[in-house]
Amino acid sequence: MKNTLGISGGLAARFQDNALTPLLAVTAMLLGVFAVIVTPREEEPQIDVTFANVFVAFPGASAIEVENLVALPMEQVLAEIDGVKHVYSVSRPGMGVLTVQFKVGEPRTEALVRLYNAIFSNQDWRPPNVGILPPIVKPKGIDDVPIVSATLWTEDTARATQDLLKIAHALEAEIKRVPGTRDVYTIGGSREIVHVELDPQRVAGFGMTLDDLRQALTASNTVAHAGALVYDNTQVPVQAGTFLSNREDVARLVVGMFEERPVYLDDVATIVAHADQPDTYTWFATGPAAEEAGIDPIAYAPSVTIAIAKKPGTNATHIADAVIERLAQLEATLIPEGVNVTITRNYGKTADDKASKLIQKLSFATMSVILLTWFALGWREAIVVGTAVIVTLAATLFASWAW
């Protein structure tokens, strides 16, 4: 009786004595090694998780008015979009924020096009002449999650959070030069503002009004293009005016004339530079594992945190290492003495650890299969099975990278 081979048996018989079989096996293994080297190591999976925040300003309105006139009508419009999973809204005085979450797997570009189309083709939901401003859409995705966060903190009581914020903004410009970085921003801290407190008696004493001061401030804090000068076949653009940038600029601002003498703003007002009221409070403190990380235990210290996100499809490990190395180089220049930098998030390291652990587990599983086959059937069969498993894994890794 003649035995008929099935599909797998016929395929094996075809390649058993074929001269291309060793070449294909070696090629598959080399492609697998190539895929392991070039595949980006990322903490967050490269899947389409699209959501967006829609900001609608309604100046002067209360939270209840924002909810009734902005949030509820917008929720109805956004809920009709195909592929939307959830719509959330937050109403506060003068502003409504709506969050649109799409289903996992919805293509990002198509989802955002549908969102913009729904918002700007349904502008008639806004009541006329009530002061509701056009919506602002800020889309977010999986690549907006920071891969590195560096916390700047200090125990120096002479430094305030606005000092840390200035240092952080200076570091942002340097970090953005690292290839592969996408979004760099700072969390926490207080901006430095100039507070002007007018003295009504001094204003009246110089024969001025509040409207005179307002016009002087508005006219002085402007920059305009004033033409160009041509010299030696070179055109030099000319700008008139400067922006007010510090307390001294504001204090020495001429706001009028009195008895043929200029009146400066600090003649009629008390001008103080100080930190603005913070939107968030950020502190740095250590836990039980501080000594293991090489950090001296501290209770609480003011801090700001620089968050760094990466571009899609790039290697988180390489970018994180480059960012940390760049911060180390800046410690002697932009980071003054007494300000400490602690890496509080490093998804590059965790992604590399997980990838290495996966390869170790695959290697352990392959060796276990080879040893089990060796003990049960013999060394020849173990070599055949081990080679087949390794080649299959290598081809799978390459296919995963390619598609």
List each language-model region with its residue ranges.
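Membrane-proximal extracytoplasmic
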Residues: 1-366, 374
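Hydrophobic transmembrane alpha-helices and their membrane-interface caps
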Residues: 34-38, 367-403
